[in-house]
Amino acid sequence: MEFRPLRADEIECRVSTVSEKGVSLLLYKDARCDMNVLDESIGPLNWKREHTRDNANCIVSIWDESKSQWVSKEDTGTESYTEKEKGQASDSFKRACFNWGIGRELYTSPFIWINASDVNLIPKNNKYTTYDRFSVEEISYKDKKIVGLKIRNENKKKTVFAYGYFDEDIDNLSKKIGQAKINLLKKEVERIRMADKQFL
């Protein structure tokens, strides 16, 4: 069973770190995204979730018609700051869905850094914070890896991060320089991406 990669509107952005120089972001999915993908891909009656150990663990099972049995994958979650039991149940469910491959491509995200000029920073207790909201404006994949990503600051109403390449970029390039040179460019982008990961 393989699941499609997530669309831009299904991916959330979370602020990871904040300093006077800017903020770093992480990409994540919520439990509703997982439920929607499961419903869409295999049907709402062909999967189920169970929680054990006081919601610490979640088992997501998918019906295998060829074997006439449920196939299950399990993972554990962590508590949220606001709602302990609900947050833990949601987190364990999302992690179990990662085990099935839903949203696993998010692990290939580049390091997302937003400069201070593109975010509203607020001094607080000798540190900085921000209440800006960020969204994934566009995303592209190749071989289950993120190769293109654009992030929008909804408060400033502009694109504040751009990485890699997109299908329309390739189409435009192919008309100008030919497919052979495009393939070389793709390899170079991938080489730089791997080098960045090793550096980080």
PLM segments and residue spans:
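Interfaces that engage single-stranded nucleic acids at replication/repair/recombination sites
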Residues: 1-19, 23, 113-200
